[in-house]
Amino acid sequence: MKKFILLAVLFLFLAIPTVPSTAVGIGVSREPLGAFKITAYHGSQVKGRKQAVTASGKIAAAGRTIAVDPRVIPMGTVVEIEGIGTRIAEDTGKDIKGKWIDLYATSLHEARKFGVKRKQVYIVKGG
């Protein structure tokens, strides 16, 4: 019986919202950076290589890697892009300046198909 009461109290405690409304999970919050221009690129655009080695030394991966202006978003920063998801700033580009993010895409075709979008961007903190 004591275990049941303890579990019930724990459940009620966890059910009470205690994190800010901008939170993406327990102990994780988002810091808004504003609207960014969002484009996409692929490794075949990078000096004819099949694998793109990022400015951080990692192999670029679709669904993870973004190129950023490191003066705006520091390398290694996790960001959430509205309607796209969470990505990591692992690359830069000579033309990527200011509020512009370039997503690494699965293919050159997908990168071109993505086009240019404008999305809200948040730095993900904590976790």
Task: Please report, for each region that a protein language model flagged, where it lies by residue.
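Solvent-exposed, well-ordered loop and adjacent helix/strand elements within mature globular domains
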Residues: 2-4, 19-127
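Bacterial N-terminal signal peptides
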Residues: 8-16
